[in-house]
């Protein structure tokens, strides 16, 4: 069985042969981390075009190795809150072994094309594998238009521990601008649409990232308040959904502190 180092080298070679990205002419690095960065840069930039079976077999083997390098996080590993069906998880959403994780997508729905970018969309697409971008391309081709803010789409999670990914596009907030009622409602729609889709798909566990708080600039405090209020209201309106366990995933210490505070007791997100 080839090592991850060798698999990366072979994948890089095949991707560079295509000459489809700006990194196609970079020399093959001798360090593992540098190879990982170059492979990720190449696959991040690659258009949503069919891939060869040879490449996909290599990627499958590499991502299987990645998947075996950590212990997945289940609901029982998550932090309990004062609500029996709401949990907190502080860490990397890619490690969650739940029915579905929510991805903060953009309107193209094809993942992030910026090489090695730190956004959640980039991380999820990279380590779910290239089949995810192709699946999203099929959705967008059938739809025939960009994805609207506040909607939700379901795909397989491919190489991630989760079974599915729910993709939703949140609203943007320009730095220094206040959160208008329209944008607050659009963010709430992201949560409602994702919850509705999860129930429609028969899912029993769903992990939300902090939608719109990264690259899209939504203030973290207001976003956390909207997320929790929307989920609690949705649960009250859908008593039949009590079997759906909901996890709020936080990645920064600021987000964790906000969710810890707001989930201490009912209606504590004013």
Curated annotation (Swiss-Prot):
Domain Macro stretches: 73-267
Free-text remark on how the cofactor is bound: Binds 1 Zn(2+) ion per subunit.
Cofactor(s) this protein requires: Zn(2+)
Coiled-coil region: none
A molecular function GO annotation: hydrolase activity, acting on glycosyl bonds
Class of this enzyme: hydrolase
Catalyzed reactions per annotation: 4-O-(ADP-D-ribosyl)-L-aspartyl-[protein] + H2O = L-aspartyl-[protein] + ADP-D-ribose + H(+)
Residues binding ADP-D-ribose, per UniProt: 92-93, 106, 119-121, 212-216
EC assignment: 3.2.1.-
Sorted UniProt keywords: Glycosidase, Hydrolase, Metal-binding, Zinc
Residue positions binding Zn(2+): 112, 117, 119
SMART domains: A1pp
PROSITE patterns linked: MACRO
Its biological purpose: ADP-ribosylhydrolase that specifically reverses the SirTM-mediated mono-ADP-ribosylation at an asparatate residue of GcvH-L, by releasing ADP-ribose from the target protein. May play a role in the regulation of the response to host-induced oxidative stress.
Family: Belongs to the MacroD-type family. Zn-Macro subfamily.
PANTHER family: ADP-RIBOSE 1''-PHOSPHATE PHOSPHATASE, GANGLIOSIDE INDUCED DIFFERENTIATION ASSOCIATED PROTEIN 2-RELATED
Protein name: Protein-ADP-ribose hydrolase
